[in-house]
Amino acid sequence: YTTYQKQFAECFGNHIGMAFKVVVCGVVVGVPLGWYAYKHARAGKVISTILNTIESIPSLALICVMMFPLSFLSNRFPFLKDHGIAGVGATPVFCALFCYALFQIVNSMYGALKVVDKQYIDAARGMGMTVRQIFTKVEIPIILPVIISGIRVSLTATVLGVTIGSYIGYGGLGKFILQGLNGFAIDIVMLGTLPIMGLVFLFDFVLKKLVVLIEIHRKAKGVVKV
């Protein structure tokens, strides 16, 4: 660690930064997309088919697939490189992991909305609520623990997935694992592996506790649960 202290700090920051960017974007896109898939059955089948197909592709293969269109675009439009969009590095890693995160969050949203008791929706309509108000004031509070559970699965999977980015030049903690394997240096491998494991267990623990706290608060307030 002493030898690679500065490099470790940079790689650690890159690793966490990529994971959070992927999951935040996944939530911003996935929550409304999951709601749309639930409200429109035909579109929901198309969305589900696309996301299930992407989910079935191995991580490294999907990252490599992303490299081709991104390389073409960055060569065709050179200004994209000035904004960090290229066929190697962070962009293909982000795009691939974003697709996986989207799968988890959309599925969580869709599955949770399906089991919301219709009597609460009907009661909200009877009070004159709009579709948006029903979603934000009725459905979201009911399914919030399920959404957070989906985010938990997505975040832990993304932290692991960022590791693979080292194979195409992204400098996360996977860089130490790859470097250690190439040099048969177990200490360097562990320098990358242990922090990744620690992050996975930490995020999993924190988000599980958050779900428990929300459930306790809901019981105190008398809010229904899925």
What residue spans do the PLM features occupy?
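Glycine-rich helix-loop "coupling/hinge" segments at transmembrane-helix boundaries
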Residues: 68-69, 160-190, 195-196, 221-222
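Cytoplasmic-entry segments and transmembrane alpha-helices of multi-pass inner-membrane transporters
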Residues: 33-68, 97, 107-114, 121
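Short helix-to-coil transition segments within interhelical loops
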Residues: 113-143
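C-terminal transmembrane helix and the adjacent membrane-cytosol boundary/short C-terminal tail
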Residues: 80-81, 85, 95, 111-114, ...
